[in-house]
Each structure stands twice: as C-alpha cells, then as structure tokens.
A protein has these predicted regions:
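Extended, compositionally biased non-globular segments
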Residues: 210, 222-320
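Sec-dependent signal peptide recognition
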Residues: 2-9
Length: 320
C-alpha cells in the first residue's frame, strides 16, 4: 500500500517573482517576450517515500543575464505508479539534469518545428522531470511492431488506446531503460502539488523558453477576469485510416513480458500518431498545442504550450 503522505520537505519551496540578486530584473528582451523574473528562484529537495522511488527529488531554477537554468535529478516529487511493472521493466533512477532556456523566447515559426522523441526532451516540468510525448515504438505495413526502436512508418502512441501498453501510471508517465521517469501527458499529481487542478497552472518550460501550462486557460485570451476553461486541442481522429495502415497486430516485440508475441489482434484507430490530423480552428490551440494569451504569470500575454487530456497530449513541435 502506497503511503498517502509521501514527502518530507527538506528545503522551503522558493518561488519568487523577484530575482534575488537583481541580475535579470533590468534585462530587456529585444523583439521577443521576457520571462526574466518568473520562477527563477526555486530550490527544492524533497524525500519521496513512494515505494517505486524512495529517493530525494532535487531541482533548482535560477537565471543569469540571458538564460533560465535548471539543475535537477529527474526524480518525481509526487506519488507514482509501480515500477517496474508488467509492461515496463524499468526502475526509476536519478538523472543528471542540467538545462538552459532563453529568458527571451521569440516566435520564429508559423507552423512549428518537429522536435522531441525518446532521444530528447521537448520540455521540462518544474520538478526536472522531462515531457516526452512520443515513443520509439513503430509498426510496418504488415503489422509487425516493436515497442522500442521499431522499424516502419507507423509511430505508436503511448496514450489514448488499448492496443499497446507502455506501463504508464496515473501521471501518464513511465520509465525509460536509462531509469528516466518522464511524462507522456497530463502530470496529474504534479498539478496537485503545484496548486489547484481548477486553476491555470504553470507546470514547466519548453526547450524554446516558452512556458507550459496544464489543461486550463482563460476563456478570453486577453482577459484575466474571464472564466477558466479546459482548453481543447485542435487535432481530430481521422474518419478514414491512411492508405497502407496496418489494421492487425501480427508480431509484437518488447510488449508484455518484453519478448516476442503474435497477438493477431486489431490495431484500433488512435494507436498511431498518423491516425490524427490538425483541423485549424476546431479547438482552442494551434498545431503545436499552444496559443497566445494572458496568464497569471504573464498578464500582458505570451505564447504558451498546453498539456491536454486529448491528443497530442503535449506539443510535438516548437514555435520558438
């Protein structure tokens, strides 16, 4: 039984809108947004007694004249699922996270540049756990699939279907072979740790320097006094599968038991990234799951990414 009380707070969680040494307060961004004084004084060390963690979660956010600096060990500061488990054989291990983000993010692409995947992080949460929504799983046209380092044109999604099981927990996260715990979607218990699930909560920073919020935003993008709503992705499930899409899972490598099986089962729509299409204007967000608007931390407005409950769950591209 997992303990309901998981944390021993060692250091006070320091979040400040003022840079303590004044190094970034007077820094002006040219031609872009400024994030210079937002969440740049965080230093936290928490013991997570969850049976799958049993380690300190350590992370700090500071800044210099040009960059936001993250140092952490990638250990979650909240309850997690059981790891290893039947569909994920990996244990959570400390990482060495050192990342920098510009304090002056600028929109440079109208449609976004594809990034991320198992080889890299598209964003980091406040607790130094990375957001990495894609998987290395693929299938070929014959329905021969691998859960990791697969071959073929069809990219397997981690969430939103029952065909493939990557062993995710209640935070839509699991563990890579390196021991790195990472989010594929909504980090539910991190949101609870940071504040109310009904609020607009800043949960991290994207690699291009823009902020990341979870689920909610203002109904009027320009009005801090407007109601908080659940923001909708603009991606839709295709009504007709793409030509050549495999419909039957014939061979599975690295699935349950991590061996080779021959399921001969249907591959439901939504199991592949290619099963979705962007329909401009059908939701609240753009093709990178973001938008421009006011936020509690940026009352004058900024471009921000959103973690959503539906595909793509988190951005697959960056605009900065």
């Amino acid at each position: 039984m997992k303990s309901a009380k998981l944390f021993l707070i060692i250091n006070i969680f320091l979040i400040s809108c003022q840079d303590t040494d004044g190094s970034s307060t007077d820094y002006l961004c040219e031609g872009g947004y400024s994030t210079a004084d937002i969440l740049v004084n965080i230093n936290e060390e928490i013991f997570n007694s969850d049976e799958s963690v049993n380690a300190f979660s350590k992370f700090s956010w500071t800044s210099n004249k040009t960059s936001r600096l993250l140092s952490g060990n990638g250990v979650p500061n909240h309850e997690v699922g059981t790891f290893p488990n039947e569909n994920n054989p990996n244990s959570i291990k400390e990482q060495n996270i050192n990342q920098s983000f510009t304090l002056c993010p600028t929109l440079v692409s109208d449609t976004g540049v594809s990034v991320g995947g198992p080889a890299g992080a598209i964003a980091y949460a406040i607790n130094s756990v990375k957001f990495d929504p894609a998987t290395g799983g693929r299938c070929n046209d014959s329905g021969e699939c691998s859960m990791a380092q697969g071959q073929g044109n069809w990219n397997i999604e981690a969430l939103g279907h029952n065909t493939f099981d990557f062993g995710e927990d209640m935070n839509h996260a699991h563990v890579q072979p390196t021991g790195e715990y990472h989010y594929h979607g909504m980090p539910e218990l991190l949101i609870d740790f940071l504040g109310s699930s009904d609020a607009m909560t800043l949960v991290g920073w994207a690699s291009d320097g823009f902020p990341v919020y979870a689920r909610n935003g203002y109904s009027d993008t320009n009005d801090l006094n407007s109601s908080i709503i659940k923001l909708r992705s603009s991606y839709k499930l295709k009504s007709v599968p793409d030509q050549g899409r495999p419909s039957i899972l014939t061979v599975l490598n690295g699935g349950m038991g991590q061996g080779t099986t021959y399921p001969n089962t249907s591959i439901e729509m939504g199991a592949f990234t290619q099963d979705f299409e962007y329909v401009k204007g059908s939701g609240d967000l753009d093709e990178c799951n973001g938008r421009i608007g006011v936020t509690p931390e940026f009352p004058n407005g900024i471009y921000y990414y959103v973690v959503t409950d539906d595909f793509p769950y988190f951005s697959r591209c960056l605009k900065g």
